[in-house]
Amino acid sequence: MSNSHTLFEAAQAHIPGGVNSPVRAFKGVGGDPVFFESAKGAYLTDADGKQYIDYVASWGPAILGHTHPDVIKAVQTQAEKGLSFGAPTEIETTMADMVCDLIPSMDMVRMVSSGTEATMTAIRLARGYTGRDKIVKFEGCYHGHSDSLLVKAGSGALTLGVPSSPGVPACLAQETLTLTHNDSEEVKKVFSEIGDQIACIIVEPVAGNMNCIPPEDGFLETLREVCDESGAVLIFDEVMCGFRVGLTGAQGRYNITPDLTTFGKVIGGGMPVGAFGGKKEVMQHIAPLGPVYQAGTLSGNPIAMTAGLKTLELISKPGFFEELEAKTTKLVNGLQKAADEAGIAFTTNQVGAMFGFFFSEEKDIRRFSQVAKGNMEQFKAFYHGMLDEGIYLAPSAFEAGFVSSAHTDQDIDDTIAAAKKVMATL
């Protein structure tokens, strides 16, 4: 019996399901979750002392790998000065300046403590700014677990949304329209009929919660156009893809300017953090400048700001993202070749240092319905095979993978070799 199994059994006594976030429970792949004790660079070490090459990266933040010495040193220095003050600090301003310098669409930014808090508040701000209630989201995109966003589509594009979780009031869900991701025509149709009632569109410009799904040509442009025509606010949820697919995020990569953007993950350097920001015209409606309320005890926490600032400084160095993307391409191509040699129906997607793979006959996967049709049994078998080989992937067929600057060419080669071995058994 493994130490992870023993720890999981003990955890379930007082933690619901034994985990503090559902995907960690391994329900998507079966078996016990792995409990980790330490991490360094591209490697995780579990409670039994086994090492794994890590492609989960704490679900995205660890773009530099784990325990980067410069980040650790900066955090230790700040910790000696104080963990939290509940008052303004200079580093909050320094961090805000850097984010706004890197992201041209951001005139102002507000720091919060999680991605969910960022998206929740961005939607509240859009509603307050426009005086409208309805919002548009897309099937397969995840924007945290606030009530307005735990909604699935009704029977048609204009049908009232229905809650996707108990505890979400139907009256709130009715204000959320869930449309087909990457379907420009459906977006145009909805806006032609009720565009003057819609406060905002929120979208992951690179969807990372139905694996890794890039935008189809013209999709993001359509969102910008209908928002301009209707007066709705365009929100890019870059909590996952921001500072991951490039230094200027997905909006820089695809040259689309949103009105508001949400960030998280990478900008905290491994600490809990979120942020939302955008055009001054919109942001000046947030308290204390305006009437739209938002507050947080740990917003702008100096430890999180320190870790995030150091991370942004390091990833801003010339050539960082080019090297990271090249590593990711090598990995993705190697996985595809391993599957092809084994005669396995397999497809990969990549945007920058984000990647995804699908056990599927389809070769151009751009929508949630395509992801859901994948061979989940093959995915589970592949997942556990790779785990046995010391490769830690996301324990869900609906989550993206991440490469860090700590991954070496040898790490990539070892991962591809493991994939060849496992693919041959499927």
From Swiss-Prot:
InterPro entries, sorted: 4pyrrol_synth_GluAld_NH2Trfase, Aminotrans_3, Aminotrans_3_PPA_site, PyrdxlP-dep_Trfase, PyrdxlP-dep_Trfase_major, PyrdxlP-dep_Trfase_small
Record note on quaternary structure: Homodimer.
GO CC entries: cytoplasm
SUPFAM superfamilies found in the cross-reference section: PLP-dependent transferases (SSF53383)
Protein name: Glutamate-1-semialdehyde 2,1-aminomutase
EC number: 5.4.3.8
Pathway: Porphyrin-containing compound metabolism; protoporphyrin-IX biosynthesis; 5-aminolevulinate from L-glutamyl-tRNA(Glu): step 2/2
Keyword flag DNA repair: no
Catalytic reaction equation(s): (S)-4-amino-5-oxopentanoate = 5-aminolevulinate
N6-(pyridoxal phosphate)lysine: residues carrying this PTM: 265
Family membership noted in the UniProt record: Belongs to the class-III pyridoxal-phosphate-dependent aminotransferase family. HemL subfamily.
BP-aspect Gene Ontology terms: protoporphyrinogen IX biosynthetic process
Keyword terms: Cytoplasm, Isomerase, Porphyrin biosynthesis, Pyridoxal phosphate
The organism's place on the tree of life at top rank: Bacteria
Classification via HAMAP family: HemL_aminotrans_3
Keyword Isomerase recorded: yes
Cofactor dependency: pyridoxal 5'-phosphate
Record-level Gene Ontology MF annotations: glutamate-1-semialdehyde 2,1-aminomutase activity; pyridoxal phosphate binding; transaminase activity
Originating organism: Hydrogenovibrio crunogenus (strain DSM 25203 / XCL-2)
Lineage: Bacteria, Pseudomonadati, Pseudomonadota, Gammaproteobacteria, Thiotrichales
Subcellular locations according to the entry: Cytoplasm
Pfam families named among the record's database cross-references: Aminotran_3
PROSITE patterns xrefs: AA_TRANSFER_CLASS_3
